[in-house]
Design a protein with these regions (language model features):
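N-terminal short beta-loop-beta anion/metal-coordinating cradle
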Residues: 2-70, 76
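Proline-aspartate-enriched helix->loop->beta-strand connector
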Residues: 78-82
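His/Asp/Glu-rich mid-to-C-terminal helical/loop segments that flank catalytic regions of hydrolases
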Residues: 225-258
Length: 258
């Protein structure tokens, strides 16, 4: 049975973060925080910018993210999920410091051929899983406003853009130029023009489809999924991605209240 928080008169919104650095800014502003530990995860209930929320870390990888998402729906009764994180840029024109708001997700490491076409999820009859259009549009608008804000523009990414499109997920950190090229070309050959690559989103998308829960995802591009990815990643998350997540979610929740 879902746990309905006494802090919230309406169903809470889940705000998922991929990494602790991204969650810190949100935690600092959480009003009436209340921690519940479930499934070896800490879930923080409270209010943020006028909205009842549950904050959680997805943990890393598809299975971990699916477990967290299921717990949010089953245990806390959330009916909307928003996920912030970082990703490697794959698409042409997608550069470090940009943001990609997902329209769909695909698993780049799923291959049940010859029983099913490569990338197709068995028994679902599809390879791609759609994000909620209305929620994603709000997130796109919030991202655009946040990136235009002086405090972010002055952080060295004044030319940062917001993109919309397909993101690929898989259980490996793509960090080589050759690996990145092979992945991009293979997916394009199957009709999947991917803008970015990460490790959780497709699993969240599949769980949300199963439960009929709307969700939206934004990913800050931390690297180009090439040979420098492992070097760029830690510094970028600490210095930039955490500020992006905080600023974008703030604007998103304010827009939702209006």
């Amino acid at each position: 049975m879902p746990l309905i928080s006494s802090l919230a008169v309406t169903t809470p919104i889940a705000i998922l973060s991929a990494l602790p650095q991204e969650q810190r800014g949100l935690m600092a502003l959480l009003q009436q925080p209340h921690k519940i530990t479930h499934a070896s995860r800490d879930f923080w209930l409270g209010n943020l910018h006028g909205q009842p929320v549950v904050l959680a870390l997805s943990k890393i990888g598809k299975v971990a993210a699916a477990t967290t998402t299921t717990a949010l729906i089953e245990r806390f009764g959330v009916r909307r999920i928003v996920f912030t994180g970082v990703a490697g840029g794959l698409g042409q024109g997608v550069k470090v410091g940009d943001v990609v708001v997902a329209t769909e997700f695909v698993q780049h490491d799923l291959d049940a051929s010859p029983l099913f076409p490569r990338y197709e999820v068995p028994l679902y009859g599809r390879a791609r899983f759609h994000c909620d259009p209305a929620l994603s549009s709000l997130l796109f608008e919030a991202s655009s406003k946040a990136l235009a804000h002086e405090s972010l523009a002055s952080h060295g990414y004044s030319g940062a853009c917001v993109h919309r499109g397909l993101i690929a997920s898989g259980d490996r950190f793509v960090c080589g130029a050759d690996e990145s090229r092979i992945l991009r070309d293979a997916m394009a050959g199957a009709g999947h023009e991917v803008l970015a690559v990460e490790m959780e989103g497709a699993a969240i998308a599949q769980v949300c489809l199963d439960y009929g829960v709307p969700f939206a995802v934004m990913r800050t591009i931390s690297d180009r999924a090439d040979d420098s990815a492992h070097v760029d990643f830690p510094d970028f998350v600490e210095a930039v991605a955490s500020r992006y997540a905080h600023a974008i979610i703030e604007r998103f929740l304010i827009q939702l209240s209006n």
